[in-house]
């Protein structure tokens, strides 16, 4: 541990990171990073690490092994988790709370093409039964409309969540997906 590093508790470090990234990330991404950093901070506390200055390459390696083996994360999830931890440590290095070399030494899991694809599919028969049920008992409910849109368009769930009333064209009728970066 370097003598010129500040003593910053892991939970305080999380707050510093989220404040620093507030302007750079969308609300949803910031929330995701918060969950990922919270998992890392909790693990650090379980390891009796009370200052971020104590975190080194071996600490991050042990966390990665813990997430993979004990928490059962798949490679693509682990890559996202460790990538966020690396960003976290870079921000902390910028405020002298972590040795700057730690973040740069982190090796991310390699995800081969196709490993990041979720192969789960909703079978046609199941989808039709669900839609029939919703048509009869929950017509025009949020669940009904969401399943109907997903089934008819093959849209990703993230796209569905991003839809706004202005995306519906009554003339066509059609839905138009638009990227809406956060307003500053």
What spans do the regions from the language model cover?
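Short alpha-helical hairpin
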Residues: 4-17
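Hydrophobic core segments within long, regular secondary-structure runs in both alpha-
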Residues: 10, 57-64, 124-131
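N-terminal core-binding DNA-recognition domain of tyrosine recombinases/integrases
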Residues: 15-117
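Short, surface-exposed helix/turn micro-motifs that flank interaction/cofactor sites
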Residues: 86, 161-162
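DNA breakage-rejoining catalytic core of tyrosine-based enzymes
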Residues: 112-129, 184
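Basic, Lys/Arg- and aromatic-enriched nucleic-acid-binding interface segment
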Residues: 124-157, 161
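Conserved tyrosine-mediated DNA breakage-rejoining catalytic core shared by Y-recombinases
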Residues: 162-184
């Amino acid at each position: 541990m370097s003598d010129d590093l500040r003593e910053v508790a892991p939970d305080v470090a999380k707050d510093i990171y989220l404040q620093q990234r507030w302007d750079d990330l969308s609300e949803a991404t910031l929330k995701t990073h918060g969950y990922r950093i919270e998992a890392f901070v909790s693990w650090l506390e379980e390891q009796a690490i009370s200052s971020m200055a104590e975190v080194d390459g071996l600490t991050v390696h042990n966390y990665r092994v813990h997430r993979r083996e004990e928490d059962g994360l798949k490679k693509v999830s682990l890559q996202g988790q460790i990538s966020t931890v690396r960003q976290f440590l870079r921000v902390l290095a910028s405020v002298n709370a972590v040795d700057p070399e730690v973040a740069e030494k982190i090796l991310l899991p390699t995800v081969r093409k196709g490993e990041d694809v979720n192969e789960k599919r909703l079978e046609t028969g199941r989808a039709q039964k669900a839609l029939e049920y919703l048509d009869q008992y929950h017509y025009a409910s949020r669940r009904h409309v969401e399943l109907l849109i997903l089934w008819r368009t093959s849209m990703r769930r993230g796209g569905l969540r991003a839809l706004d009333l202005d995306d519906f064209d009554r003339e066509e009728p059609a839905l138009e997906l638009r990227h809406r970066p956060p307003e500053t």
